[in-house]
């Protein structure tokens, strides 16, 4: 990993971003391809989805809409340990997510004047579960549970067909969907799948959804940008990121293992260690060398750790470490310091924060109860991770009686006149006119 020495330096956020550039992910460049694929699905429906499956996934599904019997069979075929782990993950995420649903609030502005704020779930959600270099049944859990907790009545799930399973959705994905009671699953992936969820495909019985969530590759991100406005989206997910703030009290083996755990996702994954201890850097480097050599995806891990997006950052103190992290806005932030709570108090921007030596990112990926669908690419500076709120809309309900309206009628007339919109004021005053 490259080393960046910021001791004695107070760079700006722009300088931070230049020092540790993120992977080059040009979503805009992929939008033309994504838009064309979506347009083809809107025009030709299931035929376009099958052609795209053969072209991009190497397998054509026997049925784009997965028969319910296959989902039931996939649940039955889940290995015992996997099923138990999924059931535990579902329970934990459900419990933690329940706290995200806000109660309705009623405000009495004055006599006879009431404003209620209520939270309404979208009617229908589309969940995208990626394929590619790994299989992600955990993403089924992380997308579906918040939608269910929010009260979404109808859920459709899309996942790419898998060549090794004859064009079918991976059976572990189907099993996870079945455990969650989802019986509307489609063997489709990429930009075409996002378009199908957004506009529907009548011949498949696929009705349009109001929100699409879930991570994917650059074309999925581009497709989300294309369909925004037709439907809501959660975010444009990029490659995974981990930033570890550690001092010399941390266990270098733990830190190295956590950096590697995210590097194994993709050659473009970002792994950063920010520390005030040069001696600790050497200990972590030795552990990285040992652990990376023994991992299943050693070549991928080495490529990620050696990429421009990964680095060891030396800083003067932990205040400077927190400042760097806030400027970077990591997807995953680990705090492994003698007083992690003190560092936490200085953190503003992160998708999720893992405090202490026994809260690795891997815990959050599967069984912490938190959600692992998190903002990447610096979006943690302004966007949250996935939650029940991703499927909820606040609505204001206004109730005024006659006297409450009369009390503000004059001011409404004054303001509407100032805006040269006299009919606004007249819509109020006519309510108090005598009618013959």
Swiss-Prot record:
Q: Which cofactor does it need?
A: Zn(2+)
Which catalytic residues are annotated? 331-332
Pull one GO CC term from this UniProt entry: cytosol
Task: Specify whether Signal is a keyword of the entry.
Answer: no
Q: What is its EC number?
A: 1.1.1.23
InterPro entries tied to this protein: Ald_DH/histidinol_DH, Histidinol_DH_CS, Histidinol_DH_monofunct, Hstdl_DH
Which reaction is recorded as catalysed by this protein? L-histidinol + 2 NAD(+) + H2O = L-histidine + 2 NADH + 3 H(+)
GO MF terms, alphabetically ordered: histidinol dehydrogenase activity; NAD binding; zinc ion binding
Keywords (A to Z) from UniProt: Amino-acid biosynthesis, Histidine biosynthesis, Metal-binding, NAD, Oxidoreductase, Zinc
* An individual GO BP term: L-histidine biosynthetic process
Q: Where does substrate bind?
A: 240, 262, 265, 332, 365, 419, 424
- Function of the molecule: Catalyzes the sequential NAD-dependent oxidations of L-histidinol to L-histidinaldehyde and then to L-histidine.
Name this polypeptide is given:
Histidinol dehydrogenase
What species was this sequence derived from?
Leifsonia xyli subsp. xyli (strain CTCB07)
Instruction: Report the gene name.
Output: hisD
